[in-house]
């Protein structure tokens, strides 16, 4: 189960179910959070997409990493292999339309900020949308998936398709 339930693969890594965020819903979410100064990362099976200039995206990646490495300076962050991997793999786009044109399924939207009050306001605002599931791994982030893409129900559906019950798996 990948992307918080947005994709299910069998043991041979074949996709057996996809439940990504449709482009129309992605656009709707982007419009909803436009008023908030928060970074958005579009997670896809072809890598992470970020909107902005190369420099803006670089700063966004540094800011995100400093959320997890609070004692590291900017200079220390940019020397890590984690940072190099992120910079090498990120797809920088100037606007949402580029993501839309690529036609790549978006599994999750990830937003983060050092401003915890901003994160709470964004979360509260997005939770009103019944088409999405809003969660977070840390108080500094917001993770959004399609409402149908939640690990528990997806796991139940998948194991039942294999002939098992939740009691047998859990």
What spans do the regions from the language model cover?
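Alpha-helical substrate-recognition element adjacent to the catalytic core
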Residues: 1-26, 37
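Conserved acidic, metal-coordinating active-site core of Asp-based
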Residues: 32, 36-38, 43-170
């Amino acid at each position: 189960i990948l992307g918080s339930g947005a994709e299910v693969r069998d043991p041979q890594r074949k996709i057996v179910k996809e439940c990504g965020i449709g482009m129309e819903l992605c656009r709707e979410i982007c419009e909803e959070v436009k008023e908030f100064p928060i970074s958005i990362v579009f997670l896809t099976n072809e890598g992470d997409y970020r909107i902005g200039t190369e420099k803006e995206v670089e700063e966004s990646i540094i800011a995100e990493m400093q959320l997890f490495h609070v004692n590291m300076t900017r200079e220390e962050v940019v020397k890590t292999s984690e940072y190099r991997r992120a910079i090498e793999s990120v797809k920088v786009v100037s606007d949402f339309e580029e993501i839309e044109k690529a036609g790549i399924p978006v599994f999750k939207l990830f937003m983060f900020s050092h401003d915890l009050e901003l994160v709470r306001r964004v979360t509260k605002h997005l939770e009103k949308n019944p088409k999405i599931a809003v969660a977070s791994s840390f108080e500094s982030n917001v993770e959004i998936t399609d409402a149908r893409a939640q690990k528990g129900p997806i796991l139940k559906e998948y194991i039942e398709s294999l002939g098992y019950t939740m009691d047998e798996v859990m």
